């Protein structure tokens, strides 16, 4: 019983780091250059630090979800316009798994992230009147990524892919155009 119980509780821990450059979709005139800098806001960069775990393959959950991983992450984001948008920090939960195993060392995976972003420069009628994209200092963060995952060594992976991100306050404050990013990721 002791050995079986031990197998039920052991998890595999992972630490990861992602760099995600992105293209900001021009959803309104503020992003197209109708802002204080009179320049398009069309680039983003985010740096992610993630902790993940997966269940032991011999546990009940490990047998149900043998390749799934889940965890928490934190990221720093810039849109190269700190005076009008800020440089938000995101805290999020994530989950991912292979969609298809392409070879013994290469898989095509998905990963979703969901959390809260803090540190935005929100719309202000006097001090930030052109920013109709972000209406609150705290916004939801939603991300979906598709990744090629290459197992370099039993302890090391290299991942590269594309992802789609949406920042929004869910219409709790206006204006709320939201911010959409289409990007790449390496980690």
Regions of interest found by a model, annotated:
Residues 8-12, 56-68, 83, 100-108, ...:
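Short loop/turn motifs that connect adjacent beta-strands in outer-membrane beta-barrel proteins
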Residues 8-54, 187:
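Short glycine/proline- and aromatic-enriched beta-strand/turn motifs that initiate or cap beta-hairpins
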Residues 11, 41-47, 85-91, 136-142, ...:
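Residues that define the transmembrane beta-barrel architecture of outer-membrane proteins
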Residues 15-19, 70-72, 110-114, 144-146, ...:
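Membrane-embedded beta-strand positions of outer-membrane beta-barrel proteins
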Residues 19-25, 53-55, 74-80, 114-122, ...:
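Transmembrane beta-strands of outer-membrane beta-barrel pores
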Residues 28, 147, 151-187:
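Predominantly the C-terminal beta-signal and adjacent terminal strand-loop region
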Residues 33-37, 79-82, 128-134, 169-176:
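Extracellular loop and loop/strand-boundary signature of outer-membrane beta-barrel proteins
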Residues 65-118:
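Gram-negative (and chloroplast) outer-membrane scaffold detector with strong preference
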